[in-house]
Regions:
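Glycine/Thr-rich phosphate-binding loops that ligate phosphate moieties of nucleotide
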Residues: 1-151
């Protein structure tokens, strides 16, 4: 599945991309479609992480924020499994905006506050490495689908 209901949502990517559900059968259930959608979003997050993390200092922590993911333990576990790293759940509202501002200021050299303003974590999800391997194969299939359909 390609989860681009609103196009791709990152700079330089195709804002006109559309969602794709491949391999659906008469026996496919609504919950399987929902699961595929949430997993496909996690694969895209992992691709972004692959691009960003080489530029991040060691010792980073992956933090999930936002109502949709914070209210879904299954999705949080899936995100941890797909990323292959622990995922902390923010105990604060607006942590996405806060984190973005902190990273931007840090990258610009204006503020070196990453260590002084740690996020408050309510819970941490640890990856299941067996599932991480399965999800790695699924990420490859998603990349192949993307390449075939969007170049």
């Amino acid at each position: 599945m390609l989860p681009f209901i609103a196009g791709e949502r990152a700079t330089g990517w195709s804002t006109s991309a559309t969602g794709v559900l491949e391999g659906i059968k008469i026996s496919t259930t609504p919950i399987e479609i929902l699961q595929a959608m949430l997993e496909s979003v996690a694969y895209r997050f992992a691709m972004v992480a692959d691009l960003l993390l080489p530029g991040v200092k060691s010792g980073y922590q992956m933090i999930a924020s936002g109502g949709a993911i914070q209210n879904s333990p299954w999705w949080l576990q899936t995100m941890s499994d797909v990323l292959g790293v622990p995922v902390g759940v923010s105990a604060e509202e607006q942590d996405t905006s806060r984190g973005t501002a902190i990273l931007a200021l840090n990258a610009l050299g204006v503020w070196d506050g990453l260590d002084t303003h740690a996020a408050h974590i309510a819970e941490t999800y640890e990856p299941n490495h067996e599932r991480s391997e399965v999800y790695g194969e699924a990420r490859e299939r998603q990349a192949e689908l993307y390449s075939r359909l969007l170049g």
